[in-house]
Amino acid sequence: MVIAVEGGFVHEEEEVDHPIRYLPLGRVYSSSAPCPLPKKPRSAEDGKPPVIVYYRRRRKKPRVEGPPPSPATAPPMLHPREDDEDEEVTRRKGSLKYELLSLGQAPPALGGDGEEPARRRCLRRSGGAERRGYFSEPKRRQRQGVHKEAASSAGRRWLELEIEAADPLAFVGLGCKVFWPLDEDWYKGSITGYNEATKKHSVKYDDGESEDLNLADERIKFSISSEEMKCRNLKFGISNLNKRGYDELLALAVSLHDYQGLDPGDLVWAKLTGHAMWPAVVVDESNVPANRALKPGRLDQSILVQFFGTHDFARIKLKQAVPFLNGLLSSLHLKCKQARFYRSLEEAKEFLCTQLLPENMLQLQKSMEKGSSDANSNKDVHSCDNLSEDKTAESGGDYDEMTPIELGNLRVSKLGRIVTDSDYFHNKKHIWPEGYTAFRKFRSVKDPHVVILYKMEVLRNSDIKARPLFRVTSEDGTQIDGSTPNTCWKEIYCRLKEKQRNVASGLDRDVCQGSGSYMFGFSNPQIRQLIQELPNARSCLKYFENAGDTFRGYRAVHVNWKDLDYCSVCDMDEEYEDNLFLQCDKCRMMVHARCYGELEPLNGVLWLCNLCRPEAPRVSPRCCLCPVTGGAMKPTTDGRWAHLACAIWIPETCLKDVKRMEPIDGLSRINKDRWKLLCSICGVAYGACIQCSHPTCRVAYHPLCARAADLCVELEDDDKIHLMLLDEDEDPCIRLLSYCKKHRQPSTERPSLESNLAKPAVVVQTDAVPPSGCARTEPYNIHGRRGQKQPQVMATASVKRLYVENMPYIVSGFCQNRVGHDAISEPIQSVGFLDVAHQEAVGNVSSMIEKYKSMKATFRRRLAFGKSRIHGFGVFAKVSHKAGDMMIEYIGELVRPPISDIRERRIYNSLVGAGTYMFRIDDERVIDATRAGSIAHLINHSCEPNCYSRVISVLGDEHIIIFAKRDINPWEELTYDYRFVSSDQRLPCYCGFPKCRGVVNDVEAEGQSAKIRVNRSELFQQ
């Protein structure tokens, strides 16, 4: 506890030889309390610090409910007279400035029963009643029985459960307790029901109030036993602790905001020239050591601060200091990505919780240097003891109640907590949480023929508080302590070998081969993943820096991929019979089956990627090689996750199983200089980068950042691959090349739209060559229209085309015209309700067959045709669609390729102004939608389309489906790329987009088809 005296701050352990200026409220208003006198110096024989009576905000609650004390035995309540209550509250606000530093709460008006009425406030993300408002009036709660621990049934414990993957009705009837951040307390209740419409559970608290909550967004625990978890099919869940860190810090700042200013002991954001805003604490002049040379300044216009993390002192102006809460609301905690900045935030959070500065900060202050070395050492040990006890009481309870994890012969009962005040509780390979407890069966050191249970613990060393102590205790009473896990188990192995020498026992040599980390369970991938997800795990810099997943400089990069029809791994859009496209039915990610390692065909059943499956991590993992979120990710050999594209492009990484494309290996072989490269595109100093393949260029970038920036990330030139001398038995070596924006290869020259209009096209009757996998559609040709064909007429028609707007044709049914009635308002209003229903339907996860049936049943209500700005008629969306949605099926007459060629040459080409609507399924089937079909054949071509075509298989039948390539807004025209392939025809394009290539033809495909490739072995055959 911190008490303000004349001349600065003094802790309750320190000795003062002058009168105390500020006293607790209990001693001020107590008639029986003795007059405060200065304390005498402590004698050297005293082993404990003197006991000082101090004021507590709340009484310590017992664990077991007991009978209420009788009026005769109850302690006297200290409170002012009722008529002077308002006057005393006003007078006490200023006098408790320094006393509140150790309390962390506002001084309430004491009630008649001696306890303050609890003010329950809420800081939620979801909207709700007025009392959830951020600045709304807090509602008083009468919590007579909320904090009382009821005698629970045997086997019940408070656990956090998996919510998203569980049945919502399985939680109904369970007891629960919800954490309210602003109150920093749990409120008990029970789940009474579930609303299917709002997707929320009804919670009724023990004090009589009730509310509807989305359990996935709350910090909630359930009272449940192991048998009930199995019956209800519930699983133990790990909460999103990273998200809670900011909420807890904000809640602490809100609770102390009214009493935070620029006085000594207040928390602020301080600004120094050339540095980011940094959390600091205001200190007094007497706390600054004499050897610190600070910049002089006027006392009334400057303050002294000590920064968290760096522990440096500085004198700043008043305008350079910002209250801590205001800085959090202004997102100052996101302005810096340095490791010491994150450590300063953790120290600031610890200060708000305990109102005690870190030990290193106190040692640097002048008041810590006055005492003798013995007193300082005793005080340091005592403060460390208190700190360990406080932290254990604060966070240890959550992990004591975890469900034991069974991993073969290993059983982990407690994960413990991450130690942030010492760097000795982790190294480059492992993290050792304090309080970690595990059990393992092994041979007894007394009788090697008997297998007993060993208990393994990670404790804090009582002699050296900054170092861990590993303890192994057996059932027969043997206890072994060591500084490392290997030390403990090495001693056990030595005793077993010594016993083997004395007694002729057939002890196997392989029994004593396991390392200490293996025996404790720290090398297990599942345990390692759980430890990494503990709170404050990212503060273990040595561990994460060695793994390349350093927390320093990380910032998530969200990429809005425009080409949803491209594979997320190889970035190709071609689909083959033996390598079909797969789309995740939940996140809409598109990959090739071989690129993702799916060996068995799906046949239209539900398919989910690794991150969307039920066994996936609850918190979406981030790639350890780049900051880009989402995408095709696979697990690594060390328990992390990485993009397949990153693993393919980084030279040191590889795949252990190429067929299944997992796991990713070789992260430890990545050159340490590659981790230090800064991406020139996203600017995030995180992950491993590749460099430009130009001989003299060293520009670095992440592989996915380069793909998002349209840089050249491709295979080596095909013209050079055939020159490589390879044996037929060897796998061909393919070199991956990437070029920066300056050195990327120039794109193929695309013909301009004006050149196509200036030169009239000459129609040549040739044998129609069926294209591969694209629509055979001929846009309307203005040169083939009837009437005059002079250049003036063509120019007039082209100018007129620019002023034509999209006019959808809306079918509204019969309605009688009347004055002031808008005939289009009713259909638009009805479409609005359809939009909401469609969005709700799309949000559900369904298989390919279910999506196909839903598309067939609703495409008439979702789509309409009308006048198009591009050409003739087009198809428009009535409602909004998400990327990956099925839009419509391309329907027509199924014919053989020879029949389609005859129809096109003899009939369709002779019709003036008629188009050819043929879509090829494979080499044996073509869909002719010229005379029969749906409105899908009216979808126009665009060089920057919002849809794409794809052949899917549903119940053994193949269908051509038009998919949404990106999110489509209402009344937006649908377009896709025809990719017309013809060596002698050039069809002009009128889409008008900035990246228009001028023609409908697929120039790249035509160039590749013109090349003739012959295997090198065939050239030398006789």
Curated annotation (Swiss-Prot):
Residues 65-78 have a biased composition (Pro residues). A zinc finger (PHD-type) spans 564-615, 677-744. Pfam families: FYRC, FYRN, PHD_2, PWWP, SET, zf-HC5HC2H_2. Disruption phenotype: Late-flowering phenotype under long day (LD) conditions. Residues 465-548 form the FYR C-terminal domain. One of its GO terms (cellular component) is chromatin. Residues 861-979 form the SET domain. Its EC number is 2.1.1.364. PROSITE patterns: EPHD, FYRC, FYRN, POST_SET, PWWP, SET, ZF_DAG_PE_2, ZF_PHD_1. Coiled coil: none annotated. A zinc finger (Phorbol-ester/DAG-type) spans 553-609. Possesses histone H3 methyltransferase activity in vitro. Methylates 'Lys-4' of histone H3. H3 'Lys-4' methylation represents a specific tag for epigenetic transcriptional activation. Functions as a receptor for the lipid messenger phosphatidylinositol 5-phosphate (PI5P), which negatively regulates its transcriptional activation activity. Involved in the regulation of flowering time and floral induction under long day (LD) conditions. Acts as an activator of flowering under LD conditions. May function through binding to EHD3, a repressor of GHD7. This is Histone-lysine N-methyltransferase TRX1. It comes from Oryza sativa subsp. japonica. The lineage of its organism: Eukaryota, Viridiplantae, Streptophyta, Embryophyta, Tracheophyta.
